Amino acid sequence: MKIDLTRLVTESRNPASEQIDTLPTLDMLKVINQQDQLVALAVAQTLPQVAQAVEAIATAFAQGGRLIYMGAGTSGRLGILDASECPPTYGSQPEQVIGLIAGGHTAILKAVENAEDNRELGQSDLKALHLSEKDVLVGIAASGRTPYVIAGMEYARSVGATVVSLACNPGCPMEAYADIVITPVVGAEVVTGSSRMKAGTAQKLVLNMLTTGAMIKSGKVFGNLMVDVEATNAKLIQRQTNIVVEATGVSAEQAEAALAACGRHCKTAILMILGGFSAEQAAQKLTQHQGFIRAALNQE
């Protein structure tokens, strides 16, 4: 069946850039920048739906479920990017947030021919993860019609998982398979059909909110500090110290001493200082309160 791509918003021509190939470099970039400014406004219109998705993801995490991103091309890469940043930022397990791309790891760096049209692959990739009703699947596709993603969404519904659609074309096929529909309509691209641009930026903004919101609601943030950050390099070791200082008001030396006493776990160090607990007591309190510092301090 032939698909009429010209009917899709993401495939339409943008009047603002029809003569972009004739413009001086600075004027060319001004056109791109002006179009980019429309993206955040489009995302703002979807915030109620994004909030629903954040609540669903946080609930899944609390019940031992996972967040699975699924996309092809740029959409798949954006999901993988967001998923890969969760462990170092929030100390989460790598299997808690997973990014799938049509064509597998090879497709991260190089296009895999026909992978996005492979429905069987969409289902088999999720079956390999043993997707269950505890999980949340976010299907990502600028067009909203990618067969790989739609097949995955169909399968996710069949096992009772919560399904979210993230696309940039209103009324797209993906919406029919979703419990929650997020559709930032960013309009035509500067280069016709190049959905890695405005559509990709909109997707990235939404993905940022999904994981950030869910991690905040899971107790991974105290104030605006990433208190579960892992010390995997020199920069992050210093960040841990800074976080404890900011959260407690003690000196860097005192923060370092607390971190050293608890195996460099920011939450434990903060609770030790603010609550006057030993490392063991602080760790126990965090366990009792599911990792929420405020609850452990009875500040809720």
UniProtKB/Swiss-Prot annotation:
Reactions accelerated catalytically: N-acetyl-D-muramate 6-phosphate + H2O = N-acetyl-D-glucosamine 6-phosphate + (R)-lactate
Keyword rRNA-binding: no
Active-site residues, Swiss-Prot/TrEMBL: E85 (proton donor), E116
GO MF term (any one): ether hydrolase activity
Domain SIS span(s) in chain numbering: 57-220
E.C. number: 4.2.1.126
Pathway(s) annotated for this protein in UniProt: Amino-sugar metabolism; 1,6-anhydro-N-acetylmuramate degradation; Amino-sugar metabolism; N-acetylmuramate degradation; Cell wall biogenesis; peptidoglycan recycling
The UniProt record lists the keyword RNA-binding: no
EC class (word): lyase
Any one of the GO BP annotations: N-acetylmuramic acid catabolic process
Highest taxon above the source species: Bacteria
Protein keywords: Carbohydrate metabolism, Lyase
Complexes and interactors: Homodimer.
Purpose: Specifically catalyzes the cleavage of the D-lactyl ether substituent of MurNAc 6-phosphate, producing GlcNAc 6-phosphate and D-lactate. Together with AnmK, is also required for the utilization of anhydro-N-acetylmuramic acid (anhMurNAc) either imported from the medium or derived from its own cell wall murein, and thus plays a role in cell wall recycling.
UniProt xrefs under HAMAP family: MurQ
Miscellaneous notes: A lyase-type mechanism (elimination/hydration) is suggested for the cleavage of the lactyl ether bond of MurNAc 6-phosphate, with the formation of an alpha,beta-unsaturated aldehyde intermediate with (E)-stereochemistry, followed by the syn addition of water to give product.
Assigned protein family: Belongs to the GCKR-like family. MurNAc-6-P etherase subfamily.
The protein's name in its UniProt record: N-acetylmuramic acid 6-phosphate etherase 1
Organism: Vibrio cholerae serotype O1 (strain ATCC 39315 / El Tor Inaba N16961)
Gene field: murQ1
